[in-house]
Amino acid sequence: MKTIFFGTPEVAVPYLEILNRYTEVVLVVTQPDRPRGRGMVITPCPVKETALKMGLKVLSPEKITDIEADLKAAGADYGIAVAYGQILKQHIIDIPKLGIVNIHFSLLPKFRGAAPVQHTLFAGETKTGVTAFWIDKGMDTGPVFAYKETDILPSEDAKTLFTKLISLGGILLEDVIEYIRLGQIVKIPQTKNIFTPQEDGSMFKEELPLPTYAPMIKKEDTILDFNNFGAETFFNRVRGLACGPHAKVITKINGKEDLLQIIKASLLEKNKQCPPNMPRGSVVSIENDGRILVKCYDSCIYIDIVRPAGKKDMTAASFANGHKIKPGDVIFY
């Protein structure tokens, strides 16, 4: 079958490779070439680079509507979109005969939007997955085609979870391609209850989850506050921001305020207690394993790895010792 691929960043490359393996990719659509790297040299995106190496036709319009005629001329049976980066209007969605399927890194309707992996971790979810859905005019609101689910381990952060979901999504895309080849087109509404007939003649009502949203990460999302963040919330925010921009805290050392990036944090072991009377933002202990224990809103949390402004990653203990910080000092705000 003939297909069009819509995608831009590195995470989308494996999906183009899969689509090209099983279908005839007649057109690849990406975001325009942008300045990248230290020299800010105009460079094609990863999907475009890969597509050109494959010998595929690539278009990179500023606006998708600029290539409407090319999309129609391609004569595609369906499209696949992965992190394309532009909203597709209904008249564009309708061009491929069957429509366009998007691969989204959450279990829709939960975490619709640009940053589903980050917000899934912010929320402390223990399960997530990848959803293939038919694009409509809404933001990730179209009917579900298929999905795959996976557990989230406490040790996982945005980096490791992205890696897992990219792989899982590849398996899902292979399923989608095969379903379409066999004519098994599925469209399940995201937010309407599903009624399934039972053997006794009754109807089983499946309650679908309410939609939640995952907007693009803003600067204010990265600033953590020991006075108002509990240990679980702090830990989950650090995990969710592991791909960058990283979590940051305000430090005040010798009268100087600065922002310190938190690269890794960990929860207090269940068999250990947090001193109840120490002020929030104070250093409780400096551990031999390189961590420091800090008092937060409702408990204590370990800070493992930090990145001071203009410097490389280091253990939190190295940072503390370098600034002659000792237990009891209040340095975080």
From Swiss-Prot:
(6S)-5,6,7,8-tetrahydrofolate binds at residues 106-109. GO terms for molecular function: methionyl-tRNA formyltransferase activity. Its EC number is 2.1.2.9. Belongs to the Fmt family. CDD domains: FMT_core_Met-tRNA-FMT_N, Met_tRNA_FMT_C. It comes from Elusimicrobium minutum (strain Pei191). This is Methionyl-tRNA formyltransferase. It catalyses: L-methionyl-tRNA(fMet) + (6R)-10-formyltetrahydrofolate = N-formyl-L-methionyl-tRNA(fMet) + (6S)-5,6,7,8-tetrahydrofolate + H(+). Keywords: Protein biosynthesis, Transferase. Pfam families: Formyl_trans_C (PF02911), Formyl_trans_N (PF00551). It is an enzyme of class 2 (transferase). Attaches a formyl group to the free amino group of methionyl-tRNA(fMet). The formyl group appears to play a dual role in the initiator identity of N-formylmethionyl-tRNA by promoting its recognition by IF2 and preventing the misappropriation of this tRNA by the elongation apparatus. GO terms for cellular component: cytosol.
